[in-house]
Swiss-Prot record:
PROSITE patterns: RIBOSOMAL_S11. Keywords: Ribonucleoprotein, Ribosomal protein, RNA-binding, rRNA-binding. Part of the 30S ribosomal subunit. Interacts with proteins S7 and S18. Binds to IF-3. It comes from Pseudothermotoga lettingae (strain ATCC BAA-301 / DSM 14385 / NBRC 107922 / TMO). It holds the Pfam family Ribosomal_S11. This is Small ribosomal subunit protein uS11. GO terms for molecular function: rRNA binding; structural constituent of ribosome. One of its GO terms (cellular component) is ribonucleoprotein complex.
Amino acid sequence: MARRSEGKKKRKILTDRGVVHIKSTFNNTVITLSDADGATILWSSGGTAGFEGTRKGTPYAAQLAADKIAKEALRLGIKRVDVLVKGPGPGREAAIRTLQAAGLEVDSIKDVTPIPFNGCRPKKKRRV
């Protein structure tokens, strides 16, 4: 007898709150929507928005990725989000503005960019 393969089970989202993680680098912007525990619900990036190469790092690519996340979040019933921003890229502000404009209520914006407390020695000319 053939075994039935079990696919991924979609979890029902029971809350109207979520956390949006925006990781913005100079090459790309990755936006992830998770629940309060940190479990990923959905994600999008400059690449999944249809951009390739250096255009993935543009604010416009981040805007399209954030719009996709916001529309899907509203469809799932998530209305209020906390935003955690990481990285120095150009897509940070564009993504936050798009989330607000799309109808999500942004409760807080927090910068969680990792900064070393005198960690590893920078290479060559990068020493300041």
